[in-house]
Amino acid sequence: GLTAIGEKAFSSNTLREVVLPESLTAIGSRAFASNQLTQVHFPKGLTIIEEGVFNRNRLENLQLPKNLTTIGDSAFSNNGLTHMEFPESLTAIGGSAFQGNLLTEVKLSENMTTIGSWVFANNRLTEVKLPERLTAIGDRAFANNQLTQIKLPRGLTDIGEEAFSNNQLARM
C-alpha cells in the first residue's frame, strides 16, 4: 500500500475529505495545503505531520493519531478548528501550527516540553492548562486570544516575547 505522499502532492485543489490509508507513514510538507478539507481521517501509525500539510483548509475538528510525536510549522494554520485534544505521545508543536483558527479550548499533552512561536496565536482561547513538564513558551505563542487567567508551571524557564499579549489576563 501507499507509504508516502510527496511535498505539495494535492495542494491547491478543492478536496473536501481525505481518508489516509493505514499503510501511510509520511506526508510531505504542504501536501494538502489550500484545499477545502472539512475532514481528515489519519492512519493510526502516523507519527509526524510535516510543515504546512493542512494549512489553509476548512477543518473544524480533528482526531489526531495516538502515536503522533511531532506537528510541524503551520501544519493546521488558517482553518476553522474550535477545539483540540492532543495525544500524550506529542512532545513538540512547531511554530504557527494552529495559528488563525477558531480555537476556544485546547487540551495539551502532559509530555509537552515546548510550545513554539505563534502556535496558538490569533484564536479564541479563553483558558488553557499548561503541562507541568513545560519549560519553554515561544514568542507570541498565545497572543491575540481571550485568556483571562494563566497558571505557569514550576519548571517553566523561558517565556518568549509577547507570548500572552493581547488577551484579557486578570490573574496569573
Regions found by a protein language model. Give the residues of each.
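Consensus positions within tandem repeat domains that build extended binding/scaffold surfaces
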Residues: 6-9, 28-31, 50-53, 72-75, ...
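Structural signature of tandem-repeat unit edges
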Residues: 1-4, 13-26, 36-48, 58-70, ...
